[in-house]
UniProtKB/Swiss-Prot annotation:
<protein>
    <recommendedName>
        <fullName>Microfibrillar-associated protein 5</fullName>
    </recommendedName>
</protein>
<keyword id="KW-0993">Aortic aneurysm</keyword>
<feature type="signal peptide">
    <location>
        <begin position="1"/>
        <end position="21"/>
    </location>
</feature>
<dbReference type="GO" id="GO:0005201">
    <property type="term" value="F:extracellular matrix structural constituent"/>
</dbReference>
<dbReference type="GO" id="GO:0097435">
    <property type="term" value="P:supramolecular fiber organization"/>
</dbReference>
<keyword id="KW-0225">Disease variant</keyword>
<dbReference type="GO" id="GO:0005576">
    <property type="term" value="C:extracellular region"/>
</dbReference>
<keyword id="KW-0272">Extracellular matrix</keyword>
<keyword id="KW-0964">Secreted</keyword>
<dbReference type="Pfam" id="PF05507">
    <property type="entry name" value="MAGP"/>
</dbReference>
<comment type="function">
    <text>May play a role in hematopoiesis. In the cardiovascular system, could regulate growth factors or participate in cell signaling in maintaining large vessel integrity. Component of the elastin-associated microfibrils.</text>
</comment>
<dbReference type="GO" id="GO:0048048">
    <property type="term" value="P:embryonic eye morphogenesis"/>
</dbReference>
<comment type="similarity">
    <text>Belongs to the MFAP family.</text>
</comment>
<dbReference type="GO" id="GO:0001527">
    <property type="term" value="C:microfibril"/>
</dbReference>
<comment type="subunit">
    <text>Interacts with TGFB2. Interacts with BMP2. Interacts with FBN1 (via N-terminal domain) and FBN2.</text>
</comment>
<keyword id="KW-1015">Disulfide bond</keyword>
<feature type="short sequence motif" description="Cell attachment site">
    <location>
        <begin position="30"/>
        <end position="32"/>
    </location>
</feature>
Amino acid sequence: MSLLGPKVLLFLAAFIITSDWIPLGVNSQRGDDVTQATPETFTEDPNLVNDPATDETVLAVLADIAPSTDDLASLSEKNTTAECWDEKFTCTRLYSVHRPVKQCIHQLCFTSLRRMYIVNKEICSRLVCKEHEAMKDELCRQMAGLPPRRLRRSNYFRLPPCENVDLQRPNGL
C-alpha cells in the first residue's frame, strides 16, 4: 500500500503544475511550430558543444588581437624545420543529441527529451608533420608484429619468406 504514495503524488503534481511551466534550462517546442534552425558547428570532440553566439563573440575578440611578429616568425620556423603541411579531409560524423519536445494532451502538457541524429558534413584540416607520420608508421609496424626499421636493416630479425615462389608456378608439360 505504501508503494502507491509516490505514484499518486506524481499524478497529482502533473495536474497541479500549469501547462506553461517549463523546467529551468529546457526550451520546448511542438512538432507543428518547428522553425528551421541555423546550421550547428561542431568540435573535434563530440562531447563538447559549441554555442554559436559565444563562438562569434570569441572570433570577434580574437580578430582584434594581432599576433606579434616574433610569434609569426617562430611559427614559420617550426613549420619549415619540421616539414609540416596542412591536410584537408572530410569529417562526416553522426551526432546524437537530445532535443526537448513539448507535448500536450488536452490541458496537460509535459516536456520530454527526444533523441535526434544530426549528420555533420564538414571539411576538416589538420597539421601533419613528417616526424609524426614516421612515428605512426613505426607504431603500425609494432602492432603488426614487425621489427623496427633500424633493426630490420641490420638483419637482427628476419621475417620468414611470405610465399615460396616455386610453389606458385604451375608445373608445365
